[in-house]
Amino acid sequence: IKPLQKLSTSVIQEFINDIFLVKSPLSDKPLARESVVGIRRDLSAILRKAMMLKYISLNPVTGTRIPRATKNLDEEKTVVFSKEQVQQLLSFVKGTPQEAWYSLILDGTLRRGEALGLTWQDVDFDKGTIKVRNNWVEGANDVLEMTTPKSLSSIRTIKLTDNTMRLLRKENIRYKEYKLKNPDFVDSQRVIFMNNGKPWIPKSFYRKYKRTLEEAGLPPISLHGLRHTGITLQLEAGANIKAVSNRAGHSDIQITFDIYTHLTKNMEQETVDIIENILSPAVNN
């Protein structure tokens, strides 16, 4: 353990680089970039407090950066659902609030914090859009807080499908009914809410999602994987990659290219199969 005075920017940067290699106890996979960003933010807040108390003169976190994580593309293939698995999940939760929740994340390609931070004021039922401008996270000492999204590009307006908007309208009606019937209802105004009106604790929401996957007989793909699934399905359907990147809130279109490069391999094989089906009869005759 180093004394506070010996915590240099280079030491903190080395620590940040190292935690990219740490595996999450929930998924047994490397920590998501958002988790590393949160750790850096919390560490900066702690050391800022140390500055105020005159223990250190400078915050060593200032000047550090979050490196771009390198991912194995073979592993990347395993973190998304197939079209059939998406249908299986949505069929399993049909008629429950979870149908709206997971449709929202898939359709809007939302991060967990963005989805849980969405309020009814962010939903425009007339235009069929949502405004992503909040991030509901667990900060230092597990304190829940509403922050701004991870980057300027993450603040965005997203047009949703008619089906997702229909599900959100049902959830809005459910919210209002619960509010009228329950005098102890907490008017959090969250789109994704617990039955008592309170917003979900991110970890609790994740555990509920994981239990649902298990009950539905689906692989334990993370919520971030659900977001990736939404992006992947849009790209596979032929959507413009720039439009998909903007919709996902990626700060750089290269991020979209890097993560979903494996799609071009899938599409190439599909193209070969199509050509083979066309030419094979001619060759055999």
Residue ranges and their predicted role:
Residues 1-55, 198-204, 219-225:
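N-terminal core-binding DNA-recognition domain of tyrosine site-specific recombinases/integrases
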Residues 72, 80, 136-138, 248-274:
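Catalytic-site neighborhood detector that most strongly recognizes the C-terminal catalytic loop/helix
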Residues 83-86, 161-218:
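Active-site/catalytic core of tyrosine-dependent DNA strand-transfer enzymes
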